[in-house]
Amino acid sequence: MFRSIAALFILSSIVFSKETINKHQLQAVTNKSKETSKAKTEVLTGLDILLEQKPYFIQGRSIALVTNKTGIDKAGIPNYQRFMEMDDVDLKMIFTPEHGLFGKAADGEKVAYDSIGIKLPTVVSLYGNIRKPTPDMLAGVNTIVYDIQDIGTRFYTYISTLGLVMEAAGELNISVLVLDRPNPIRGDIIEGPILNMEFRSFVGYYPIPIRYGKTIGELADLMITNNWISPAPVLDVISMEGWHEKLWFDETDLVWVNPSPNIPDLETAIIYPGMCLIEGTNISEGRGTPHPFKWIGAPWIDGWDLSQALNKFDLPGVEFVPKSFIPDKIPGKAENPKFENQKCSGLEIWVTDRDSFKSVDTGILTLFSLYAMYPDKIELREKHLNMLWGNNILFKELVKGSTGPYFLQHYN
C-alpha cells in the first residue's frame, strides 16, 4: 500500500507537503463522482404514501405531530403545512426533537418556543425540561404521527424521543403512526455493541447496536415486538415505496435536508457512528469547524504522527490525512466548541470506499491510538464515553493499556 508517502498533486506547480493529496484521496474523489453520477432510485416516503394513497390514517382524527424540518413531502412542503390544509384533520400540537422544528439549535441546547413568527398550532420542544409528552399536552389527541429523518445511529437522540413518545401514547391509549423514511447509511450494515441497559440514557435508550441497520419504522416495530414499551400503543407504520436496504441516501431521488446542524451531508452521517465516540474525550470532534466529525484534533496532537499511525492499520475504505484547524463559536451549531479559538492539529478523515468503510472500527482505533500516543494529555470522560459505547468495557480497556486491534478482536 502506498500510504506513508504523499503523491505529487499537480495544479499549476508541484507542491511538497505533509498534507499533499495522495492517491487514496484522489480515489475518494473518484468514488464520490461515481456515486453522484448513478441513476437515482425513485422513493416515496411514508409521508408521500400517506398523502397520496392512505390519507384515511389521519382523516377524522385529532393528531399531534412529532417532526422537524426533515419532515417534507416530495415537493418539499412541510408535513404540518400539508396536514393543516386537510379539512378533516385536526392538528392540535407539534412536538419537536433536539435542535427544534427548524434544526437551528446546537447539539445539546435546550429549546423553548414562545413565538416562532409563523401561524402554527402549539409547538412544544421535547428537548427541554420535558422530554416525554404529558397527559395535559396530549389532551384530546387520539393519534400521534412521527415523521423525522434519522441517521441510523443509536446515540442520535431522535429515536429516544420516538421511544418516549410511544411510551406516553401507550400509557394514554393513543395510537401512533410512524411515517417511514430511509436509513441514509443503509439498512443492511450493523456496527458496534448492543447497549447494556445499565448504561441507558437519552443517548442510548434501547438495546440496539451503535449502527443499528433499521429504518425508523422498522425500529418502532422492534420496540413493540420486543416488549421494550409497556403498555404498548397501537402502532401503524406507513412503509416507503422504492427504497431497499442496500441504498445509500444519495442513491435515491430524495432531497437531503440536514437532520441537525452538525450533520451537514451524507458523508458526515457515514462517519458519525464511530467518530462521535471522540465526544467522550477532551479532544475536539470538529464542532466549530466546517466539517464536524470529519476533522478531529487538539493543540497538543501531531497530526502527521497520528495520521501515519492510523494509516498503518490499513483499514478498508478510509485514509487519514493531517489537518490543522481552529474551532470557533458558530451560533446554532457550536456554542461552546472544545479549544475555541485555539489552533488544533489532528486528522481529516477521507472515506475512499463507503461500502467497505467501518466507522465504528475507525473510531475505536483512533481512540486507542490517541490514548497510547498522548497518555498525559488525553482525558476520558468516563460516564459519557460509557453511554456512547453502551457499556464500560471500552473505557476499561483503554485505561488498562490494551491495543486497538486487540479490542476489535475481542469486544467489538
Q: What name fits each language-model region?
A:
Residues 1-37:
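Bacterial Sec-dependent N-terminal signal peptides
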Residues 90-98, 179:
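Short internal beta-strands
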Residues 103-107, 177-199:
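Glycine-rich, charge-decorated loop segments at or immediately adjacent to ligand/cofactor-binding or catalytic sites
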Residues 111-141, 153:
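Glycine-rich oxoanion-binding loops at beta->alpha junctions
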Residues 150-162:
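Glycine/threonine-rich flexible loop motifs
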Residues 200-272:
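Conserved anion/nucleotide-ligand pocket segment
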Residues 243-328:
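Glycine-rich, aromatic-lined ligand/substrate-binding cores of catalytic
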Residues 297-410:
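Conserved functional hotspot residues or short segments at active or partner-binding sites
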